[in-house]
Amino acid sequence: MQIHNYKVINRMLALIIVLTLIVTGCSKPKTQSEDRIEFFGEPKNEFGNIEAPNEFDWRQCEGIKLNFICEDNINANILSKEVEKFTKVTGIKVNVKRMDFNTLEEKINMEFISKTAQYDLIYVDPYKTLNRFYNGLEDLNKYEKDDTLPHIVGGLDSFSTEQLRVCSYFENTDKVYSIPFDSTTMILFYRKDVFQQYRDQMIQDLGYDPDPESTDFTWDRFIGVSKWINDHVKSGELKELKYGSLTMSAKHNSIYTAFSSVLSSYGGDYFRNSRVVSLGTSTSYEILSRSTEFTKALKKFKEIVNLNPDMNEGYTWDEVANSFSEGEAAMMINWDENISAVENSQVAGKVGYSILPKGSVRSSNLYGGSGIGVNSYASSKKKLAAWLFIVWATSPQVQMKTFLEKDGGTLPTRTALVKAIDQQYSKEFPQVRAMVRSQMPEYAYYRPKMKKGYEFEDIMISNLYEMVRGKIDERKASINIKSQWTARN
């Protein structure tokens, strides 16, 4: 118990240090207006306090109950634990309804098709919700630009520019549909203890350094190391594991996301128009699936998936994460939001983290962040209450708690906080270096955000699944993708 309390105290002190660092080194001093006050009682600092006009009544929405539909991830988990602090100040009760990815997608589809306003706060996936239902989301400019209301701490400029463009806008920047909430990216998880133990033997047999954090760690080396581990597991020499690697391969959104990182690492892309992967578009463009880079990436992805122990129905991201956390695999490609589960599992303290292996062009790490938006079909009173919640839920204090908590560990969406974390926590938290690098422009990859995103992903998932199961080869997959996309447009 004493050890636990010591860790809690250390984490709280660390939070104060980071916020102080932000004030002194990561942000410009901001003059507090005489007619605005801070709230929620956090330590006063020039970057992090939520402000409102002196006459603003924080309890004007007291008694209102909001339903927030959200994916069950680290951010939602921490928010569920912290939300009583928001209720205590405002009198607004928020039910954070966490659910798995597929259920979330189904319920949000039903919500906007029926226009029932069953959920007031929406977890806005830019590739599933923003691209299709932006007209059902409230324009948050109405609240952010209203001088009589609390505003986003630090303003919209405090968020990563590219993440803001992906999560908050559609086609143009006229309307703000959501505020960046989480910022997960694909990274490589690996059993550091196993790699250290067998490093010399791997070097002797493979002829290269197998370290996944090496700048020379390519997809070909990933494949070579995985095969080496599989062979030594089968021979009985390596008893700590069951598999060299696990890669997402089910007929599920996960296979498309896993392939996307491989595609970009070999210099490929889905479309030529850069707006498709940023602000998004209602227009459908010609797909590049017949390009040399695309076909090469398909072939390489099939090689990677073939390392999985058996095909069956394939693996989703949850199944891959569960197997790795149980100590079965040496490496996995997955979202960094799995760090909490991994570091609270039987492999805790034994795991290393890196950006994904390089293709012929670069290491490419798929971005998967989302925002929080307000249902435009909710009542005006609930919309105001929802805005107050968003201001609080995306504040620096809450985002830092999400990073520092035992069940947390993912990066905030604010540029200054990420910079501070990189400077202060790279040694203490083994995942920080990989997470920060994965979001850098030279390593990050943003997938298409289109009005017809559902149709596009359906085509990709179906053909990738058929290919990795051996029903079609990479050439046929590339032809099918192009012809099926053309037919739907």
Regions found by a protein language model. Name each.
Residues 85-162, 197-198, 323, 330-331, ...:
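Extracytoplasmic "Venus flytrap"/periplasmic binding protein-like
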Residues 221-230, 261-314, 356:
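Glycine-centered hinge/linker elements that transmit conformational signals in sensory
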Residues 93, 113-114, 170-174, 193-194, ...:
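Extracytoplasmic/periplasmic substrate-recognition and gating elements
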Residues 62-73, 92-97, 121:
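Short, well-ordered beta-strand elements
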Residues 35-60, 126-187, 350-357, 423-427, ...:
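Hinge/lid segment of periplasmic solute-binding proteins
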Residues 171, 366, 415, 430-485, ...:
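C-terminal capping/gating helix-and-loop segments adjacent to ligand/active sites or protein-protein/ligand interfaces
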Residues 52-57, 73-91, 193, 460:
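Short, polar/charged alpha-helical segment
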Residues 127-145, 161-211, 223, 247-280, ...:
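Periplasmic solute-binding protein
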